[in-house]
Amino acid sequence: MTYVARISYNFLNKESNPGYYTSSTYFGKAGDIFTVAFAIQHQTDGTGTATQQGDFTAYLVDYLFEKPLGNNLGVLTIEGEYKIFDAETSAAALADPSCFCMFDGDAFFVSAAYLLPKKIGIGQFQPYVRYVKNNPDGSNFGRGSDLYELGTNYIISGHNARLNFNYTSGDASLTGRAGPDVNAFSIGVQFQL
């Protein structure tokens, strides 16, 4: 079982999402947003393999700033998160290719987006930039990794329908472990009812 707690403070308008589920943008519809939050997550036997398990704890600080610019000039969104990981991952688990390995160390990301004010066709463009950095402690997990992302969303119906076009460059992987340096272009679709 995973235990998670999050405490947030809304300095400006209140975010409308309940509890731990937040949005990375409100597309300007919630007015001026500036929220800072602290979270903790713990899972006994939450990392490793079926035979080499270890506990996992994470401490997080995140923020969201969103500002609809006056005179219908669009919406600026800035978001970030800093995480500290405490993972009891054994050397034997790290050597196993089936390991769901988490690392001791820290990581962060920052992003900035600008929602253009005018519709083009059925939607609005939202160009953005994002940077992700993973910093594992010690040599068991390898060196740090990072990723740059430059892209644009085409917002058709808020979070319910959008397209994404992006270019990424870096060596960060889903596990945080440094992978090969990759430069990639991708296209995504988000549709939800």
Task: Give the role of each language-model region.
Residues 2-4, 58-60, 107-109, 147-149, ...:
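Short hydrophobic/aromatic beta-strand or adjacent loop that forms the aromatic wall/cage
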Residues 77-79, 126-130, 153, 161-168:
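Conserved active-site loop/cleft motifs that coordinate metal ions or position small ligands
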Residues 144-158:
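C-terminal structured "cap/appendage" subdomains that terminate the fold
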Residues 9-12, 16-137, 146:
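Detector for outer-membrane/organellar transmembrane beta-barrel domains
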Residues 3-14, 181-193:
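Outer-membrane beta-barrel "beta-signal"
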Residues 157-187, 192:
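Predominantly the C-terminal beta-signal and adjacent terminal strand-loop region
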Residues 90-94, 141, 175-177:
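Outer-membrane beta-barrel and related beta-rich outer-membrane complex signature
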